[in-house]
Design a protein with these regions (language model features):
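Catalytic-domain carbohydrate-binding cleft regions of carbohydrate-active enzymes
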Residues: 1-221
Length: 221
């Protein structure tokens, strides 16, 4: 409970061991765990906290801001990686812009298209908010939407987060796109060890990884 002073004193004490190592940032995910219920991934909309009755949204904003503001007292250049706007509804919500210096949008599958899949009928028509049938196309849209809303450094899981097999062409194309995003994050399911993938993928992804590194001074300054 991030509103409980005693709990936060204990938690910040645990974090101090990591701060003392000199880390520069970490990823914030699973923001609504205090609100989880027997409804599965959908959290309760209200819950009694130490500070009183709070909405899921209010509590998550409190969580994001506490993590970021406390971290800045330990390292003035600390950055938290938080979720920007990636769906109309998401059980984890979105981070407030003032406490989200670095952002990702998720969780896409290892697929190319979105609209054509959603437009299907019958068993092919799946609720995107709950089952996550998203792809490369939706990552691009979410990044642009987040940027237009005021989020700054934004990216996505290269080739998507969910699935067993990453198509080679998709891995290459998503990498090329991500090289020009503020965040280049090669995370998620599927084979990510590039030396286990094709020689073509290894060479192209290496080139664009270096290109992204060369662009860092331009992107951040």
């Amino acid at each position: 409970d991030y509103t409980n002073p005693e709990a936060m004193t204990w938690w910040h004490g645990l974090q101090q061991h990591v701060f003392d190592l000199g880390i520069d940032g970490w990823k914030l995910d699973g923001t609504a765990t205090l609100f989880w219920s027997n409804l599965g991934p959908i959290p309760m909309f209200y819950k009694k906290t130490y500070a009183g009755l709070m909405t899921t949204r209010t509590y998550m904003d409190h969580y994001y801001r506490d993590e970021y503001q406390h971290a800045l007292t330990q390292n003035p250049e600390f950055a938290t990686l938080s979720r920007a706007m990636d769906r109309g509804f998401h059980p984890e919500g979105f981070a407030p812009i003032d406490a989200s210096p670095v952002n990702w949008v998720g969780d896409q599958e290892h697929k190319w298209i979105t609209d054509e899949m959603i437009a299907g009928t019958g068993k092919d028509k799946i609720d995107i908010a709950m089952d996550g049938i998203e792809g490369f196309e939706s990552a691009i849209k979410s990044i642009l939407k987040s940027a237009s809303s005021g989020y700054n450094i934004i990216g996505s899981d290269v080739a998507g987060f969910s699935g067993k097999t990453i198509p080679p062409r998709l891995y290459i194309r998503w990498t090329q796109f991500s090289a020009f995003c503020g965040l280049f994050m090669n995370g998620g399911h599927g084979e990510r060890r590039l030396w286990k993938r094709s020689a073509e993928e290894l060479e192209i992804i290496r080139q664009y990884s270096w290109l992204h590194t060369e662009l860092v001074p331009y992107m951040y300054h």
